Amino acid sequence: IRDRPSCEDFLNPESKTDITYNYLISTPDGLSRAVIGLYNMERQIANGDGGNLYVVNMCDYNTDIMVFRAGTSAAIARLNTLLPNNSDIESFWTHHYSIIGKANEIIVSAENLGLDDEVVHKAWAEAKFFRGHAYFELWKRFERLYLNTLPTTVDNLVRDYKPASTEEIFNQIKGDLEDAIATLAWDIPNKDYGRITKAVAKHVRAQVAMWEKDYDKAIKECEDIFRDGTMYSMMPKTEDVFSGADLRNSEVLWSYQFSENLGGGGSGTPLMGHRLAIITTTRYQSNAGCTFEAAQGGYGWGRVYPNTYLFGLYDKEKDTRYEKLFIHKFYYNDPTNANYGKEIPADLYGSSAGYLEKLHPMSKKHFDQWTNATQPDRTSSFKDLIVYRLAETYLMCCEAYFHRDGGSSSEAIEYYNKTWSRAGNARENGPLTLDMILDEYARELHFEGVRWPLLKRLGLLYDRAREHSGDLKSEDPYLDTDYALCRDYFVKGKHEIWPIPQKQIDLMGAENFPQSDPWK
């Protein structure tokens, strides 16, 4: 018996490296490494099979400028079967609360170490941004939140769960963002590209101010970026912003970065990438006489598209975005086919299904002919994904001046023309109307996560969704049927928010944290 190995050694594990949890939360270098983990956690919203959340957030679900075919988060897109037990809504909640939990650990650890250390202070500020940003994203979707700013320990596992007031939530968001703004730098070295800067934090702070109708604050934050954010400027052409695999250009404030290098593709397998490109790319390769081709976007699922209402907002003769940001026509590309090189007629499928999936015009913003150039049938992409860019900052500042000073505001007109004139349109001299600004938001920023919160913030989400969401056969004669269930099922006062995930209600107790009233 004495010769048998003891369990004692197994009960006293020894780390084979210096990187332990204690190291990560108790040293400046450890906190700096821990913050990098927040970037990875944030990017997971777009990774691989879990990327539905990013598609829903960015591709204008339940708005007036998108038509949905099938597949990705169908219950959210159509609203006819959306319930509190929806898995995507659960994932959205847990994703952001996971970020909040990790940020809480970093923030408290940094404060315990002392913020006099520059490395510690920077880690603290970045964690503050991520926490404030996560709460803001959650509030826009759910409104009813549990507010927590402390790390979870064995001493506080039992908690008093109760919904925080809107005032409490916004005070927390604003406080976190203000702390980040006060600490973060305008410029970062090239090796740190992709990390949060003062400009990113100010952009989000301006968004928060717009919700509060604090237009003076929104204007200040935006114009600080225009004046002091010297590493940012508008690209000469709109299409230049999205051209290439690495979207490292002067207009991008923040992007999720992807790489085909080992470890550059996110969680899961080392080369997971994301699927936004194939979800928004027409399934052209399924047409007889066609094959996978990088120049047409590679692999396409054909699930989410711009609709006819959006296309109708462009001056097709003058506005360069109409041609440069979309693919409107497809061509037979199999050299063995007799029709090789000819345009595929849009009415190929007549009254039968096929057009929406295989021939519908598509957005090129997430189109990827770069990372899949040698493997166009690959079902993932490694093209960077933009989160915020300067064009939104300018239009947000335009809107703020409009609300404060009216449609003849010289500043509102100046900022409106930053995107409008760049696209080849004759300069607009005003006066502006709210509809003009909303239309320019759509033309410039479709499929960039702007439309849904914009319409909700202005109290227009229900009206716009009921009037224009999806497409009817009468609006697009090539369709086989209507694709506009959101119009029929959007209930005013209910679908402007998501239900609290049922699992979370069960965990916290309905008596402590009840379901939102419209979803009871």
Role assignments for model-derived ranges:
Residues I1-D3:
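Conserved small/polar residues in nucleotide/adenosyl-binding loops
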Residues Y309-R389:
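Flexible, polar/acidic helix-loop-strand segments at domain edges
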Residues C7-F10, V67, H96-I99, Q172-K174, ...:
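Long, intrinsically disordered, low-complexity segments
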Residues S32-A46, F68-F142, A164-E168, L177-P189, ...:
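Conserved, well-structured interaction surfaces
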Residues E8-R69, E178-I181, K198-A346:
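An aromatic- and glycine-enriched ligand-binding surface/loop that stacks and positions planar moieties
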Residues Y215, G407-S409:
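TPR-repeat structural position
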